[in-house]
Swiss-Prot record:
The lineage of its organism: Eukaryota, Fungi, Dikarya, Ascomycota, Saccharomycotina. This is Putative pterin-4-alpha-carbinolamine dehydratase. It comes from the Eukaryota. Disulfide bonds: none annotated. It comes from Saccharomyces cerevisiae (strain ATCC 204508 / S288c) (Baker's yeast). One of its GO terms (cellular component) is mitochondrion. The keyword Lyase applies. Belongs to the pterin-4-alpha-carbinolamine dehydratase family. GO terms for biological process: tetrahydrobiopterin biosynthetic process.
Amino acid sequence: MHNKIVRIASSALTGGKLLEKLKPLTRWEVQWDPNKTKCLGITREVTFKDYETTWAFLTRVSMRSHLWGHHPLIHTSYTWVKLELHTHDIDPKDGAHSQLSDIDVRMAKRIDSYIDEMTT
């Protein structure tokens, strides 16, 4: 089996579209700019039951990230994981760099599904 890497183009989320896309991501913390006008990204922390489950989860996230060409920032220590999602390469016409994009939301939903499967 061959997995083809497909880099998904991203577009910044702003205004009403941003708020609409954030609604289902209730387990993610929103990171705002100092003026609270731009979403800079989202973070989520999770603790797994053991080391093996933690790394099984991280493997799934890394494989999906690689396939989509969009990689979260990951911090981990034994059973604890913190994920940060934001997009660096948004076209400047869409606003400041490093903000939330549609691909971040898509990745967050996929990560949520992995967490749900591995913590129940």
